A protein has these predicted regions:
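Acidic-basic catalytic patches of nuclease active cores, encompassing PD-(D/E)XK
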Residues: 1-36
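Catalytic cores of nucleic-acid endonucleases
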Residues: 2-9, 54-104
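Non-catalytic C-terminal interaction segments of nucleic acid-processing enzymes
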Residues: 91-150
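Conserved catalytic cores of phosphodiester-cleaving nucleases, focusing on short active-site segments
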Residues: 22, 44-59
Length: 150
């Protein structure tokens, strides 16, 4: 059965793993910072991007689409954030990213057992860009993670 607390813990650890990796290998000069406000609808940012991470327990191509809550996009639209919006997906076979494009997704209602009907964004996996297979949703925090995370 789905457990909210365990799901949140799992997600928070994966956020640190991904931000550490991205700061080491991609955003060396403009490091990503995790939001400390737990009420934020997105996970991290720097001067260039706003990022959201979804961690999955399947391979990237297990389904024709991947999804996340529409509240993430709605928040960024409402905030009128001018940075690039990137949605990262940590699958069992690697880290992928989708850069927001209003023509590359659809919104459909999803019946959540505990939360009722919620709008979800569905993105065709053909729009996902593979970043690396060096980290997966099964990865652990590296020993030097604190050197790369705010």
């Amino acid at each position: 059965m789905w457990n909210l607390i365990e799901d949140l813990k799992y997600g928070k650890i994966r956020e640190k793993i991904v931000v550490c990796f991205l700061n080491k290998d991609i955003f060396k000069d403009d490091k990503l910072r995790l939001y400390s406000n737990q009420k934020k609808q997105v996970d991290f940012r720097n001067e260039e991007i706003v990022g959201e991470l979804k961690s999955r327990t399947n391979k990237h191509n297990a389904y024709p689409t991947t999804f996340f809550g529409y509240n993430k996009i709605k928040y960024l639209i409402d905030e009128d954030d001018k940075r690039v919006w990137k949605f990262y997906f940590l699958f069992t076979d690697g880290l992928y990213v989708w850069t927001y494009n209003k023509d590359q997704y659809e919104v459909r209602d999803y019946q959540h057992k505990e939360r009722g009907i919620i709008p979800q964004v569905y993105v065709d996996i053909k729009y996902l860009e593979k970043i690396s297979s060096n980290i997966t949703s099964n990865s652990c925090l590296p020993s030097d993670w604190e050197d790369f995370i705010n």
